[in-house]
Design a protein with these regions (language model features):
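Nuclease catalytic cores that cleave nucleic-acid phosphodiester bonds
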Residues: 2-5, 9-150
Length: 150
């Protein structure tokens, strides 16, 4: 099973909507990111750890991700600590665009996906879902036409 370790603040910073939202309402941007990740990982066999800087304002519940706050350390330090203490890093993917953290993860044997690339993957998966829904709708409409024709 793949384990994703996600640099939450970095990911938020690379998404224009979440980045704008974070400037106004930090908690809301974090909640929205968790919702996006829950939807993306819903049918995937993966462990997800999402790291944020600072202390939690309110608890964020997630169906798929374990949310960790760095408290009096940086999220990068917590992520590095987690990577160092994993039994095996070969099935670990770190999502970040922080060069220092990405380099550390690579040296430790983790796969690294840039935040921008990960957002594109999520976006592409949403497009596929929309196309699938449209195909099903068209098929249902065609079936209804066939039954009405008789």
């Amino acid at each position: 099973m793949i384990h994703y370790i996600i640099d939450g603040n970095n990911l938020i910073g690379k998404d224009s909507f979440l980045n704008k939202l974070q400037r106004k309402e930090k908690q809301s941007s974090r909640e929205k990111l968790v919702l996006i990740l829950d939807r993306y990982f819903i049918n995937k066999k993966a462990n997800v750890t999402l790291h944020f800087d600072g202390y939690p304002n309110e608890t964020i519940r997630s169906n798929k991700a374990r949310v960790i706050y760095s408290e009096n350390r940086t999220a990068d330090e917590k992520i590095k600590y987690q990577i160092e203490h994993l039994k095996s890093n070969k099935n670990t993917t770190v999502v970040t665009s922080d060069n220092n953290l990405a380099q550390f993860a690579k040296v430790c044997g983790c796969k690294v996906v840039a935040s921008e690339e990960f957002l594109k993957i999520i976006q592409d998966s949403k497009s596929g879902d929309d196309e699938e829904k449209r195909i099903k709708e068209i098929s249902n409409q065609e079936i209804l036409k066939l039954f009405k024709a008789k």
